[in-house]
């Protein structure tokens, strides 16, 4: 499948999540019991793993289907006008804290998802019912659609706030969640396969969800998912705890059908068009456009790393080799409205997503894929864990991790962290430039920097390494407005080529590191574009 086409559609559809399900007048209707199929059957996670294992032993069959013509021909606005009725919400007739509503098939969503309700350890399939939907401006009516159509996915909301969801599962293996800010942003996936290899990427599908009815006093919703694709099948358990930071405790069991070249565990999918450090696509009136601005990593060896994101001119792939990582994630550190000026999509409220392994993951690498994009409708950033050992047919791969969705990750370095990265033409203002160079200004705050910034005797130095080229005008000086420090340097390319240059920087004093490690990858412009003015 072509990644750009798939993700452009998925990003557009997911962008509308969190909209009210129906106008307020429809929310007060009395709950209606949902129609169910068959008889309740015993269910637990071990049984679901058995189902996934059996799938992997059989030849793969596509789960996509040809939809009725009226659904195939829906445009974006028509599809978005189809809303699930509050009076048909799952668990609406109970006393618990949560409810679930369902997404309709149509537009980009052609894979029916079977959804089951689990009560007292027994699962029963929920029947698609056209009467459960308000078809809005779609031009559709219940009589036009088959009664066995199926669903596209589901969303969760609290009983106290029925018109806003806090998590949604829709399209392939994509899902999203929000923290207290209530603003959707980046997505997660159940699995990534062959992302950034240069060849076709495979997008596994969740083909069934099992929603366990929570106890009335529970703050957690448990969801199970059955995943399938040409290369692998899998069973997932999500324990979703809603709060200021939403936490998903995830267990997955994967069963490969064939060897997988690049397996991505805990994949985060985001968007970066333009920002302080990368203005290649800055023709928009808004100063910055991104769901997240950097990849943070806490390595197995205890090092904290910050890698600002870019919108590169060509596909860019980076791997950060590690063993038993403690965590990683795509973060939105810049939370200042003035830096975005968008009062429609509120980029400053977009959630960070932190991946925390529950046990040792062994050897592998955190991998980052950055894809060129011309606008914000394309999710062009992916980060995931790739095990060093390639999965083989017949194996069982068990992976457990937690996802944290919120304004800040649950763990942070005691050292100072990077708060901004800016770049521009190098040289000394007022003096004629004899050669091309590119300036980097990296701001750090936190840790011991506030105290050191006040100490005239403090000797803070920038420790800088580059893979190619030379550096000049290197400095580290107090930045009192931030109660921190600014490191600055110019990078001179070694030749007229455009080969990427890797940069590594941190601040230290008295031989001791003061900051997390800042990593960057810079692509020098072609010789024809190197203006020195």
Curated annotation (Swiss-Prot):
What InterPro entries does the annotation carry?
Gal_mutarotase_sf_dom, GH-type_carb-bd, Glucan_biosyn_MdoD, Glucan_biosyn_MdoG/MdoD, Glucan_biosyn_MdoG_C, Ig-like_fold, Ig_E-set, TAT_signal
GO MF terms on file? carbohydrate binding; catalytic activity
Q: Which UniProt keywords apply?
A: Periplasm, Signal
Q: Biological process GO annotation list?
A: beta-glucan biosynthetic process
Q: Pathway it acts in?
A: Glycan metabolism; osmoregulated periplasmic glucan (OPG) biosynthesis
Q: Where is the signal peptide?
A: 1-28
Q: Where are the annotated coiled coils located?
A: none
**A cellular component term, taken from the record's GO annotations:** outer membrane-bounded periplasmic space
The cellular location(s) given in this protein's UniProt record come to: Periplasm
Function of this protein? Probably involved in the control of the structural glucose backbone of osmoregulated periplasmic glucans (OPGs).
Give the family this protein belongs to, as stated in its UniProt record.
Belongs to the OpgD/OpgG family.
Protein name, entry field = Glucans biosynthesis protein D
Q: Which organism is it from?
A: Xanthomonas campestris pv. campestris (strain ATCC 33913 / DSM 3586 / NCPPB 528 / LMG 568 / P 25)
């Amino acid at each position: 499948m072509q990644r750009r086409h798939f993700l452009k559609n998925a990003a557009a559809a997911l962008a509308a999540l969190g909209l009210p399900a129906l106008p307020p007048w429809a929310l007060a209707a009395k709950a209606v019991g949902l129609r169910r199929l068959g008889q309740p059957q015993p269910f637990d996670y071990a049984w679901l793993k058995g189902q996934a294992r059996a799938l992997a032993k059989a030849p793969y069959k596509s789960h996509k289907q040809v939809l009725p013509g009226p659904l195939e021909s829906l445009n974006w606005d028509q599809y978005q006008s189809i809303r699930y009725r509050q009076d048909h919400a799952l668990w609406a007739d109970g006393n618990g804290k949560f409810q679930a509503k369902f997404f309709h098939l149509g537009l980009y969503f052609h894979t029916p998802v079977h959804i089951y309700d689990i009560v007292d350890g027994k699962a029963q399939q929920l029947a698609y019912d056209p009467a459960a939907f308000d078809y809005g401006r779609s031009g559709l009516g219940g009589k036009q659609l088959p009664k066995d159509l199926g669903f596209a996915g589901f969303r969760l909301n609290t009983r106290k706030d029925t018109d806003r969801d806090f998590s949604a599962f829709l399209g392939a293996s994509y899902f999203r969640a929000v923290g207290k800010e209530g603003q959707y942003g980046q997505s997660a996936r159940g699995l990534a396969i062959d992302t950034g290899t240069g060849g076709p990427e495979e997008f596994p599908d969740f083909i069934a969800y099992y929603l366990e009815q929570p106890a009335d006093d529970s703050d957690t919703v448990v969801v199970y998912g059955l995943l399938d694709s040409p290369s692998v099948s899998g069973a997932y358990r999500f324990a979703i705890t809603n709060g200021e930071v939403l936490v998903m405790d995830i267990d997955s069991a994967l069963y490969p059908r064939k060897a997988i070249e690049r397996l991505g565990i805990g994949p985060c999918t985001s968007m970066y068009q333009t920002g302080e450090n990368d203005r290649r696509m800055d023709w928009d009136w808004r100063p910055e456009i991104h769901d997240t601005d950097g990849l943070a990593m806490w390595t197995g060896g205890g090092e904290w790393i910050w890698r600002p994101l870019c919108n590169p001119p060509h596909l860019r792939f980076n791997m950060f080799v590690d063993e038993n990582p403690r965590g990683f994630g795509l973060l939105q550190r810049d939370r200042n409205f003035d830096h975005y000026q968008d009062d429609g999509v509120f980029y400053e409220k977009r959630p960070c997503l932190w991946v925390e392994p529950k046990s040792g993951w062994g050897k592998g690498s955190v991998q980052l894929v950055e894809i060129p994009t011309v606008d914000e409708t394309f999710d062009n950033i992916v980060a995931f864990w790739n095990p060093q050992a390639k999965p083989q047919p017949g194996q069982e791969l068990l992976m457990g991790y937690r996802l944290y969705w919120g304004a800040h990750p649950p763990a942070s370095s005691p050292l100072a962290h990077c708060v901004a990265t800016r770049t521009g033409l190098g040289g000394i203002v007022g003096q004629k430039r004899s050669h091309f160079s590119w300036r980097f200004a990296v701001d750090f705050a936190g840790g011991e920097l506030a105290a050191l910034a006040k100490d005239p005797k403090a000797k803070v130095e920038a420790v800088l390494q580059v893979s190619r080229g030379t550096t000049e005008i290197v400095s580290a000086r107090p930045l009192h407005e931030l109660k921190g420090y600014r490191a600055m340097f110019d990078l001179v390319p070694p030749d007229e080529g455009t080969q990427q240059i890797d940069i590594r920087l941190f601040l230290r004093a008295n031989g001791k590191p003061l900051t997390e490690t800042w990593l960057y990858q810079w692509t020098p412009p072609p010789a024809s574009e190197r203006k020195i003015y």
